Amino acid sequence: MPIVDHNQAPEVPWRPGYRKWDVAGREQGASSTLSINTAEPGTGAPLHTHTMDELIVILDGTLEVQVDGVTHTVGKDHTLVIPPGCEHAFRVVGEENARLMVFFPTLDPYSNGQTRYLEGSRPDSVRA
């Protein structure tokens, strides 16, 4: 059973102003994916869908979240439960960076066929 020191987790190239560290996945023998993310105000994720659930735990900061066309402002100590096929996007609002924990019940959740971008482009590490 691997025990992962978050400070030793590899950083994955993502988006300008948005940093991502994979803390659990294939390298740890898991069949799911867990990452810690930090995002600066004004950054986030463009509108997209996944073929599987996504859980986003807001550890710090505030997000403006668009889910199936409805916009919500969601802060620290809340969890976004995003079912398969749900159109969603978010951006950090306010002056504080956001810190997020993101879970997928699969490996390679951003690969072709698993994630469809409706706006914007794929993150740097998963460009086709």
Q: Where do the language-model regions lie?
A:
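Short coil/loop residues immediately preceding or within conserved phosphate-binding loops
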Residues: 18, 34, 53
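A generic "binding-loop/recognition-motif" signal
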Residues: 19, 43, 51, 70, ...
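A short, N-terminal "cap"/entry segment at the start of jelly-roll beta-barrel domains
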Residues: 1-31, 115-128
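Short beta-strand His + acidic residue motifs that chelate non-heme Fe in jelly-roll/DSBH
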Residues: 47, 65-66, 82, 88-95
